[in-house]
Amino acid sequence: MKKQLQKLLTCLLSGILLLSLLVTTPANQLAVKAAPAVNSPYKKACWISFLDIEELLQDKTEKTFRATVSAMYDNVLHYGMNTVIVHVRAMGDAMYPSDYFPWSEYLTSDRSNPGYDPLQIMIELAHAKNLQFEAWLNPYRLSRDNKSTVSFKTTPYYAQFLPYTIEYTAPGGQTCLALDPARTETKDLIVKGIREIVSRYDVDGIHFDDYFYVSGMADQLDIVSRKNNVNALVSQVYSTIKSIKPGCTFGISPAGNPDNARSQGADIDTWLSTPGYIDYIMPQIYWTDVYMTANGAVPMFSNRCSAWTALNKQQLPMYAGLALYRVGTNSKTDLGWAASDTNLAYQYVTAKQLGYDGYALFRYQWLEKEIAAAELNHLKNY
């Protein structure tokens, strides 16, 4: 009987929390709306992933490429954003003519030269529309599944990279490739590629996400060694960028769970307490505040935001990575996505109250999906 009462009480409390979050709109929390995005001191960004590029821009003529990118940027602006974070290297490849990496198969399906410079066009169009442009790179990843592994092995770069490449089995059984973070050759190659971008293109920033030591890649390696290897790269990337273009920012978007980020080699404690590593942090806080646990609902988004704020000893700019792709989804654990269409606005307001300086939405394609329209319209008012 006692256990039944405890269970009933837990359910009642969870229901009350859910109801309170549903009726508490961002307007209740923030009386003054933000200035237009292009003039806002807050970063309001959209990630444009290699998946977006493949779906919308692959194998296009220059004219069609320009028109499509321009329309994409107009959509970003329509929803009140001022920054695009665009994949320029997703898997040991390049969305531009590179001296060090092959053309991306997500840009041209046969990895051929498209006959124009896609990166230059994307930057020019962004700046013409007053959008900041950050070049997004995955430093180590060369492939993500069997198909992309076979594809990369057909390039002449595979033989070149082979001495410092790890071939591993990812969860699910897929064979993947990655540059070995422990090797000096890996670090040198990545830094050369970043030097190439920053010296040739007018990018406003360089951006890494959370793909460092992914599951299966080097599971036998301890966390301290992982962090040391990644730190050696991150510090050199930072100093290289600043030596070429001091105003170009370098930021990282780690996994939203700090412990998971650390396990992947992201030394977030050092980055957020010691100068010389990053200019900003953008944790991927992909939960709502109605997240179910064995003990009932918890405000997971707010809890994660607070945890990252506590780590930020340098008081660096912080931006919240938000899960646009989850809006409207039915989840057995994260109930907020299906229960409300003000999650993103609520999350942005909450993050600002905790000291964050903006957000980024993952990813572009959901700007065009009807299921996300209500969420986006609420968000753009803030």
Where are the regions a protein language model picked out?
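Aromatic- and acidic-residue-enriched segments that line the glycan-binding/catalytic groove
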Residues: 96-109, 141-173, 211-224, 335-336
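Substrate-binding cleft of secreted/luminal carbohydrate-active enzymes
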Residues: 275-302, 307-382
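Aromatic-lined carbohydrate-binding/catalytic grooves of carbohydrate-active enzymes
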Residues: 81-114
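Sec-dependent signal peptide cleavage junction
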Residues: 21-37
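Catalytic domains of carbohydrate-active enzymes, especially glycoside hydrolases
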Residues: 67-94, 200-205, 276-281, 351-359
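Aromatic- and glycine-enriched glycan-recognition loops and surfaces
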Residues: 60-79, 106-129, 229-233
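Active-site-adjacent "subsite" loops/lids of carbohydrate-active enzymes
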Residues: 38-67, 124, 134-135, 140-196, ...
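Aromatic-lined carbohydrate-recognition surfaces of secreted/lumenal glycan-active proteins
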Residues: 132-144, 207-211, 226-265, 316-325
